[in-house]
């Protein structure tokens, strides 16, 4: 499946970050970004054994023209905080992977990564503000007497909500 492409200049501010994309951008189908429906789909994927990154990326993939099977395979190593190391939350990683797909012009124009980095920081910042951290082990309460700060399903919900919002803003 080849993503639908649009060529236009996109300049906008998303939570204080100015994003400019002056080349080709993948078409974003905002009709597929209903937050409640996306959260339900991601929860279903997670219940089927998808890791947090896969649940988020596979849910958002159709809205940006990415084959969910490709999203699944590319994000397999991001689960449990990057390959089980309990570092960056996989749900964030899945959302960031989608932003890279949307913003990148590919190998011919590697200069688009700056815009992707801005969106990635925005997602991580908003997730951290909502959950006090972006670290999987801390979210899960590993090594803490207080228990988890947020469950994996909760983290997935938050990442999906934030990513849907960012994608909708990009599509405007």
Name every feature range the model reports, one short phrase each.
Residues 13-24:
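Short, Lys/Arg-enriched N-terminal segments with co-localized hydrophobic residues
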Residues 63-74, 101-119:
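Phosphate-handling active-site elements
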Residues 94-102:
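DPxDG-like acidic metal-binding loop motif
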Residues 26-32, 59-77, 130-137:
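Acidic-glycine-rich active-site phosphate/pyrophosphate-binding loop
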Residues 24-48:
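Polybasic, low-complexity association/targeting segments
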Residues 40-47, 78-86, 143-149:
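A short glycine/serine-rich beta->alpha loop
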């Amino acid at each position: 499946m080849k993503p639908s492409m649009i060529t236009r200049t996109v300049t906008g501010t998303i939570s204080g970050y100015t994003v400019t994309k002056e080349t080709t951008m993948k078409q974003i189908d905002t009709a597929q970004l209903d937050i409640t429906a996306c959260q339900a789909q991601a929860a279903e994927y997670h219940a089927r054994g998808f890791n947090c990154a896969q649940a988020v990326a596979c849910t958002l993939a159709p809205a940006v023209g990415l084959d969910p099977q490709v999203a699944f395979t590319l994000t397999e190593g991001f689960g449990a905080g990057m390959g089980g190391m309990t570092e960056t939350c996989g749900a964030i990683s899945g959302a960031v992977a989608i932003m890279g797909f949307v913003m990148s012009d590919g190998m011919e124009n590697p200069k688009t990564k700056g815009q992707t980095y801005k969106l990635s920081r925005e997602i991580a910042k908003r997730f951290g503000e909502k959950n006090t951290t972006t670290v999987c082990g801390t979210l899960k309460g590993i090594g803490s007497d207080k228990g988890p700060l947020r469950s994996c399903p909760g983290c997935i919900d938050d990442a999906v909500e934030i990513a849907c919002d960012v994608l909708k803003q990009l599509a405007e």
